[in-house]
Amino acid sequence: MAEKKDFPVFRVGIVTLSDKGYQGEREDKSGPRIKELLPAEQYEVVSMRLLPDERAMIEEELIRLADLEQCDLVLTTGGTGFSMRDVTPEATLAVSGRVAPGIAEAIRAGSMAITKRAMLSRAVSAIRHRTLIINLPGSPKAVEIGRAHV
């Protein structure tokens, strides 16, 4: 009989960035989809937030999740496109000490096999202290594709 392997449980924060979602004009489907894709035996979701595309608020939340909540991983969804309001990558880099470019590159490469629009993503991955922050696209389907490549 195969023995069961014990894996560490990673503390995760999920942040959805959407002006319309924050204002109650659109239901957040991406944040809950991320949670569904994380096996409960390996990931403990300690926080799920829906915020507007406001850089200062995003930075504050990323700092809170990394420093106060001691998350191992923070997954953001949304705010990575070309709109002037899309500031998730800038907020992520502003609070991080090091970048982890291979992760965002892998997500983009995997997504490019499905849609060429993936090249329009400005998503980044970076590290704040001991917390890995990964920007994912804003739609539930794109979240699934991105999660499959990480």
Across the structure, where does each feature detected by a protein language model lie?
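Non-catalytic beta/alpha edge segments that cap or flank active sites
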Residues: M1-H149
